[in-house]
Design a protein with these regions (language model features):
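N-terminal helix-cap/turn-to-beta initiation motif at the start of protein domains
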Residues: 1, 21-22
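Short, aromatic-enriched amphipathic alpha-helices that serve as compact interaction elements
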Residues: 1-16
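Hydrophobic pocket/interface hotspot
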Residues: 8, 20-21, 28, 47, ...
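Short, charged low-complexity linear motifs
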Residues: 15-19, 40-41
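A solvent-exposed, acidic/Ser-Thr-rich amphipathic alpha-helical stretch
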Residues: 25-72
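A beta-strand edge to alpha-helix "cap/lid" segment located at domain peripheries
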Residues: 52-111
Length: 111
C-alpha cells in the first residue's frame, strides 16, 4: 500500500484537489506556514470540503505547485512550494493520522 505521504505528494504534483481532500478526515486540518513569507497569509484549512475548494482555486489559477518532492520518512517530505511564483523550501509533516490512514492534521513549514 502506498504511504500517505506519497499519496499527498502525488495529489499535489497532479493537481488533483479532489483526491487531496479525500486524504483527510471530514474535519481534517491543513496548516501551511510557508505562505507567510510571501505576499499571502499562512493557510489554515478545516475540513475536506474547504481543502478541496481551496486547492481547486489555487491549482486552477496556477497559484500553488510543488517541485522536487523528496520523502524523508513515513511522515515527512521535503519540497519546494511555489506560491504564485514565489518559491519556498518546505517540510510537509503528517502530524496526526487515523487508524485507517486518513490525515487529521498536516503542516507545511519553511525548511
Amino acid at each position: 500500500m502506498e504511504p500517505v505521504i506519497q499519496k499527498y505528494l502525488t495529489t499535489l504534483e497532479t493537481k488533483d484537489f479532489e483526491a487531496l481532500a479525500e486524504l483527510f478526515t471530514k474535519n481534517g486540518h491543513y496548516c501551511d506556514y510557508c505562505a507567510n513569507g510571501t505576499s499571502q497569509h499562512e493557510f489554515h484549512l478545516y475540513g475536506k470540503e474547504a481543502i478541496s475548494m481551496f486547492f481547486r482555486n489555487k491549482f486552477l489559477f496556477c497559484q500553488y505547485s510543488i517541485l522536487s518532492p523528496t520523502i524523508l520518512n513515513g511522515s515527512q517530505a521535503e519540497l519546494i512550494a511555489s506560491y504564485g511564483g514565489y518559491q519556498v523550501m518546505a517540510i510537509a509533516s503528517l502530524q496526526q493520522l487515523t487508524a485507517d490512514g486518513h490525515i487529521r492534521r498536516l503542516t507545511v513549514r519553511p525548511k
